[in-house]
């Protein structure tokens, strides 16, 4: 079914752009829009795929304005990773770039709650005496609990975005292989090996 969908999408840019836009409009279907954008990028390159990327990003931008940063961040990240994979043909380098960019987004505070963490901390305190006691101890030791909470939320959200981008890229790559190189994705997946240097970089970034 998914391969048939991919075949229909690849009939032309209008099909792919329409599919990406519709998918991203639907809550929790952003991954499909991201995978479509990645498929077009892998197959045709960034410039020819730009209309599809924009079509997926516009509804995701609306979700961003509503407070959900995950769809747009995932689409942008998977597009970048698709460009790297298309040019370098190495999953190791692609994963390193994706992890690095996700880490930078976390550090920039992109994934921090737009309204701050005060309300969230208050709800946590009310819901659990143990959490209330732990947060009080942190505050007594001079730690800013709101900053800690923002870092935790940002880190978890960044991890979700990175995992979503990796899954969407793998899905797009499997579509590409199924349409144009049957069995190629399985061989590529089994051949995936991170060099010690690449593994060390991933550990340091993480």
Feature locations, PLM:
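Transmembrane alpha-helical segments in integral membrane proteins
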Residues: 156-180
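Hydrophobic transmembrane alpha-helices
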Residues: 1-55
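Hydrophobic alpha-helical transmembrane segments in multi-pass membrane proteins
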Residues: 20-33, 54-75, 106-110, 206
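Alpha-helical membrane-spanning segments of integral membrane proteins, especially the hydrophobic core
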Residues: 93-111, 144-162, 194-195
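Hydrophobic alpha-helical transmembrane segments
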Residues: 17-18, 50-54, 72, 94-97, ...
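Small-residue-rich helix-loop
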Residues: 181-206
């Amino acid at each position: 079914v998914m391969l048939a969908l991919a075949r229909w999408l690849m009939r032309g840019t209008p099909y792919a752009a329409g599919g990406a836009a519709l998918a991203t409009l639907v809550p929790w279907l952003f991954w499909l829009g991201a995978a479509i954008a990645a498929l077009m990028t892998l197959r045709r390159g960034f410039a020819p795929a730009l209309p599809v990327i924009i079509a997926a990003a516009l509804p995701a931008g609306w979700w961003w304005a509503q407070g959900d940063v995950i769809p747009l961040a995932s689409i942008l990240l998977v597009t970048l990773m698709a460009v790297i994979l298309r040019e370098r043909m190495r999953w190791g380098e692609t994963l390193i770039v994706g992890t690095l960019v996700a880490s930078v987004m976390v550090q920039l505070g992109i994934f921090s709650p737009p309204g701050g963490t005060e309300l969230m901390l208050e709800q946590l305190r009310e819901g659990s005496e143990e959490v209330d006691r732990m947060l009080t101890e942190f505050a007594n030791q001079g730690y800013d609990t709101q900053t800690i909470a923002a870092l935790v939320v940002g880190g978890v959200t960044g991890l979700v975005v990175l995992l979503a981008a990796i899954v969407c890229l793998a899905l797009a790559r499997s579509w590409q292989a199924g349409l144009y190189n049957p069995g190629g994705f399985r061989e590529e997946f089994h051949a995936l090996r991170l060099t010690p240097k690449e593994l060390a970089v991933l550990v340091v970034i993480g």
